[in-house]
Structure formats: C-alpha cells, structure tokens
Amino acid sequence: REGDQARILFAADVKAAGYAVYDVRPASGVAKSSALKAPERTLENRIYRVELDANGDIRSIRDKRAGRELVAEGKAFRMAVFEGNPSNRYPAWEIMKETMDKPGRPIDGDVRISIAEQGPVRATLKVERSYGPSKFVQYVSLTDGGDDDRIDVRNTVDWSSRDVLLKAEFPCAVANAKAAYDLGLGFIERGNNTETAYEVPAQKWVDLTDADGSYGVTILNDCKYGWDKPADNTLRLTLLHTPSTEKRYAHQRTLDHGVHHYTYSIVGHTGARTEDALVAGEALNMPLVAFVAPKHAGHLGRTFSMLAASTPQIGVRALKAAEDGDGYIVRCYETTGNPVEGARITFPAAIVSAEECNGIEERIGDAAFEGRSLVVSAGKFAPKTYRVRLAEPAVRSTLAIDNAPVKLDYDITAYTTDEFFTYYTIDKALGSFAAELIPATVECDGVTFAMGEANTDDAVLCNGQTVALPADRTYTKLYVLASAVEEPRTAEFRVGDRTYEAEVPLWKGFYGQWGWYGNSEGFMQRAKIGYLGTHRHQTDLGNVPYGFSYMYLLTFDIPEGATTVTCLLYTSDAADEL
C-alpha cells in the first residue's frame, strides 16, 4: 500500500478475447489459501512442490497429480554461464559449438534467498546472487486460482560480464531423442545437438515428452528464441550472449550489457500435450491487462467475449478491422499438425456474410457460417484468413470524437508517388512521405483527419501563418498532426489568446532505440504517433526500406472565444471532447 493506493492480486476468470468486471471492497479479514505454502526454500500449491537448493536453483519439482518428478536426480534447473565465448567473424549472430560444449558454471556469488510473497493467490521466493560484476534477481512463483500448473521464474539481470554466454539449463527426469519446438504457426520436432545444428530457434515454448508418451515438461518463455538440446533429457534456453572478438565488430564485446527483464516458466503434463503448450505459451506472453474504471452501467454487462474457438485445434492469431473498412478480418491456423473439419469460431453477433481471403485480404471464395459461428476447416498447421460481416448490434458504442476539419491553405508537397518523388521533396536529404501508404483519412484517438492529395500541395510549412478555426459551433479541443522537417523543434502554437509549446520530433528516423554500452545512447520520443509509414521516398534512393516516417498527434485546449490558431502543422481538426 502506498498512501491511498494499494496493489492487489486476485484470481480472475475472463473469457477469450473479452473482459470481465470486478469490484473491490474492503474486507474485515484476510483471505487465506490452504493450498499455498512457502516454508524454507520451498513452494507448494495443489499441483506442485518446488524445492530450491542452497544456491537458489530448483533441485526438485514434484507433480502431485501424477506422482512424477520433473528434475533429473542430482541436477537442478538453473542459470549457467559458459566462459570463453569467442567469435571473430559475426559475433552478434553466431555462437560457437566449442563454447556450448563446455560445462556450464553455476551462478553462486552472494546468494540470498527470501520470501517475497506469501498471500492467498501467489507465493514467491526471491533469489539474489551475482557473477562477477553482474547481478541477478529471480522470483520463483506458484499460484492458487490462476495458472496453477505453471511455475514462473521472473528475472531481472544487470549484466556487465564479458566473453560469456548465459543459458538456462533444464535437465529433466524425462528423456526423448526429439523435442517439439514452437514455430509460431505450428511446431517442429528436432533431435539433439549436432556439429552443424546446435543452436535452434523456437518462439514461445519447447516441449520434451518422455519417449513412452507418459509424461512431459514444457518450458515457456516470454522473449528469448535460441535453444539447444545437448542430451535426450536436457533443454537449454539462451538468455544473454556477450562474445569476445579480436578482429571485426569490436564494439560487440559489450553486446547485451545492461538491465534485462525476462521470464521463463515450467509446466509438467501427462501424455503428449503440445496443444496445451500452445495455450500456456500464449497465456504467459499475453497476460491479462487490468485497469481501473469508474462505476457505470455499460452496454455489454459484466462479461463479454468478442470471439471463441470451439477447439484448441484452431488458434486465432488476429482479429482486426478490414483494411478497406468492410467487416472484420480473422486470421487463424490449425495448431496440432492434424487436419480439422467443421471447427467453429463464434462471435457476439449474427454473421451476415463470410468469405475466405488471402493474406492481403483479397477474396478467394465464400466461407461457411451458421448463426454467430464461422465454420473452419484447415489442413495440418494451415493458416486461414476470413472476412466476416456481423449484424448491427442493438446498442452501438463509439470512441469517435465529433470533429470538424480545419481548412488549411496548403503550400508544400509532402506526399509523393513513385513517379514524382524526384520532383517534390521536403528536406535537404531530398525526402518525402510515401503517398502509397497514406489513406484518404487518418484516424487517431477517435479523431479523423482528412489528408491532402499526393503530388500537389498537401501540407503547410510553418511560416507564422494564422488559420481560422471553424465558426459553426463551439469547439473545445484542437488536434494537430505535425512533424519537424530538418531537426526536432520546439514549436509554438497560439490558440486564441493562449500560447502552447510542443516538442515536435523529426518526420523520419527511429522513434526509439536501445543504447549500446560505450557506443550509443538509448532514447525514445515522447510525442504520440498519429501516423506511421513503413518506408519513405528519397530522390537518390527511391523507396527507402525501413525508412520510417511519422506525423505526431498534438492536442491543445481551445480557450473560450478563440477563433484562430497560429502554428506549424500538416493537418488539423477542431473537435468536441467527449
């Protein structure tokens, strides 16, 4: 608790692609869980008993449901360092096999183990330790009422070691010559390390199921992608890679230096459960988002779901508005490697029409549907894209703001097509916005901006011009899309008798960047992006790939009686604030 604010943890039940409303009330006593326990160096819930050794590594995980041990006898699930990590050709991109063939060293400096949480919903052990100049903090957690079959290991690492590879090792009490690796769309089975394939990619999970299929261990992670399998019973996840190099790319000797936050999790299961691994991996990587809202009746009730699949064989990867505004686009795929027939994706309203599309939302043919359900059939790991049009809801809620455009006297051509980018430029580098990316209208935060026409005057270059605000009604907010041309600027906007200052970043470049120790400083723009282009035009280079372009959203109060604004802008709208 901090002042009049408190952090609380509770078990929530939320439907797929939906929300649930909970209210918080003071209670006379503290809720207790009979399942959660945290005696010395031990965690226990209704599913697992987890024991740490004196070094803070996980020496035992007992699955009480199946009566199985997850950790190989005499071993531990742990982080380990591999010292001597040379690479002189492509240090950031390669790891040498001789590095990984060395025995890993434990991280055992200055070990401190304490209880961080012991509540009715979650119990957590905190492990602090060091390796040379690098500092490690781990939080090992079990829950009661949440994802209780998942053991989370959250990590914060302040890393400054050199010539070292850091991995998490999982020597399991199950063994198999092959493991299943998540590819994002499906999975692949791979064997143990070879001379040429010893560091392989996976997305959110890797599963090792015993050769007899009786029991398995799934390792989840939220941001790491390199794995290896040195033995039938061992998985390893690459965490940090700081190579030594005497020749090329010498600055990469400090690769990965800095503070890192990552989580890996352990799930035990009976049988071969790759579809459960998919669900668990998604749950770790897309946790519930909680926020506080004022009490109100609302239109949709205390719970709502935008869609739900009838079987875990169908994974929904995206639900979005169609690019042309006509209906919704659903992207899904078959998850298990077995064809599926007649699966259903159900929506909250009746489907009026449905069609199968390709990846760029072009029609392929009609799709089957019944009532509120889209009928899906797919081959092994096959991706599918559908467009669905839903019946109008009885109650429509909108985030749109009632806005009106401000008339501008355009005096510069900022958006060009491929045929004209050599004729019109906006900066000394001879660049321009790529018109093929700019729609007729841009919507941001519920405000719609009407964009100018390409290859003609379509923007205003600041020169102290005064622009009249709409006079048909009283407006309370001014919304502006603006960018700086040659360098970031502090711009002045005079709205009526009130003056505002706004930081306007450059129209191109990077919005943010990690810092590289001893080489560059990290940064992130503070302005809100109103429009983002994935490439731009430049006279000598043509279409510049990954040459991002931006227009930033600025918002100002309109004082009572204001009729004009003097500003630097590309386009603007005056609007009521709802």
Where is each model-derived feature located?
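C-terminal (or distal) subdomains of carbohydrate-active enzymes
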Residues: R1-A400
